[in-house]
Amino acid sequence: MPKMKTNRAAAKRFKKTANGGLKSANAYTSHRFHGKTKKQRRQLRGTDMMDSTNVKRYKKLLSNI
């Protein structure tokens, strides 16, 4: 049986954490900041943890990472 291929699009967007979770950049951060409050912009900095209901599915895409 052939090896599973890593989904390259997912590999560029998500990183595995030491505890087995997945983290990614926040959405809504590329443009249109004039419509967002200062608090919203501040909270969108950094990374976000993926919800546990989706982690199992995305780990299959990231099988070799």
UniProtKB/Swiss-Prot annotation:
One of its GO terms (cellular component) is cytosolic large ribosomal subunit. It comes from the Bacteria. InterPro entries: Ribosomal_bL35, Ribosomal_bL35-like, Ribosomal_bL35_CS, Ribosomal_bL35_sf. The keyword Ribosomal protein applies. Transmembrane segments: none annotated. It comes from Pediococcus pentosaceus (strain ATCC 25745 / CCUG 21536 / LMG 10740 / 183-1w). Belongs to the bacterial ribosomal protein bL35 family. Residues 1-51 are annotated as: Disordered. The keyword Ribonucleoprotein applies. GO terms for biological process: translation. This is Large ribosomal subunit protein bL35. It holds the Pfam family Ribosomal_L35p. Keywords: Ribonucleoprotein, Ribosomal protein. Signal peptide: none annotated. GO terms for molecular function: structural constituent of ribosome. Residues 31-44 have a biased composition (Basic residues).
